[in-house]
Amino acid sequence: MLNKLDDYPIHQTPEPIAYSATSDRNVYDRTWFNGYSPDGSYYFGIGMSIYPHRGVLDCAFSVVEKDKRQHCFYGSRRAPLERTDMSVGPFRIEVVEPMRKTRVVLEDNSSGIKCDLMFSTRTVPIQEARQTLWSGTRRIMDATRFDQFGRWQGTISHPDGDLLIDDSECLATKDRSWGVRAVGEPETGGAPTAGGGIFFLWTPLFWDDHISHAIFFDGPNGEPLVREGLTAPLYRTEAEVPDNGQSLIEKQLTASHRVEYHPGTRLAASAEVDLIGHDDSIRTIKMTPILKFMMKGLGYTHPDWRQGAWQGELEIGHESFDPRQLDPLAAENIHNQQVVKVSDGQREGVGVMEQIFFVARQYYLL
């Protein structure tokens, strides 16, 4: 079972590239983007994943403008054997230049949503800390992820209007991840497992001449499982980004977080992240949300279009909803990203704060 990538010297096992190194049913490979205006007037998200052992390739595109509805396109198909085939019906992703430029196209379809967008990077690729989570003696997540910060150029149309996306304004975050992650239909059979929980917070932020990045996985009692903070140079154009700039990434000793929530919700009203240097210096970043995006619009915790679930040989769907009118404590609505204004007391910037938590003891709500 060969595909086009087998012509490159990239193999990590004796098998062709189509064969995963693990037989875990939840092995996956994912491409994800966001894009947003610094003033919080709009936000859009993009996702595509292949789940080889589930036989699924799925995608989503979702856009929201301030004080308007969020519009969502979903697509799913039988996973192709050819890994360079990154298309689901009217949706496709084209890697124009690896680690630099990616095109995303959603052609005319029944949702009334379409786009033609080009991402171009403004940072080197940034590899995050390894993300390994356990349930007893079993790894339920084991993933590598890298990020890039950049810009978008192109157009978006949705049922409530059109957006002209200009790279002089529109900021972008890209992440690529692969490994094992629990998705799709839940497993059945076997002995019941003990309840646990997770708290996740991610803050990719733009400043004038650099980016800052922090990621947190905490356990049900607030114990740190994964924590990382870093900074890296931000370039004015894609052409200025060096091919080999990994040494320019400055990893901090660690990071910490504090989140204040709107009463009776799991939606952040404000937050702070501390980047703690190797010299014990502390850079405190204060974040103020200005726009909310519901991650179920990309399939996360969606009751019908959850990632990795079998929908059929080729299916597409769509929906629109007002994020302000949703039940904030419904399971499908507690995963969100918020565009945030940020300040460290000397500099100001903008970025995104993502969070989700399912925990037995809600220690940070007390």
What are these regions (language model features)?
Residues 1-366:
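Structured soluble/peripheral alpha/beta segments that form catalytic or ligand/cofactor-binding pockets
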